[in-house]
């Protein structure tokens, strides 16, 4: 039987091959997580942040808020240090995740660039 190290090495190789065969342009956020080496827990934390901020965005819109700069600041402050804020926002948007929230963030960033 193969040693555990050889089995892990083989699985890593298979995953690298699978990543090359999948159209990663369709899944830029997942590709970003893989590229930056985030763990499952770290990836789930990003999703949890987006869930919470999406709920807060809906609440603030219902209350009549029109500026959401503080939500972007919260996102940037809570985002894993392995990830770039701009790159993550565009990857989430392009993959179709948290579209409304990411559109708001992109609009804010356009005003500062």
Swiss-Prot record:
InterPro entries: DUF1878 (IPR015058), YhaI-like_sf (IPR035945). Pfam families: DUF1878. This is Uncharacterized protein YhaI. It comes from Bacillus subtilis (strain 168). The lineage of its organism: Bacteria, Bacillati, Bacillota, Bacilli, Bacillales.
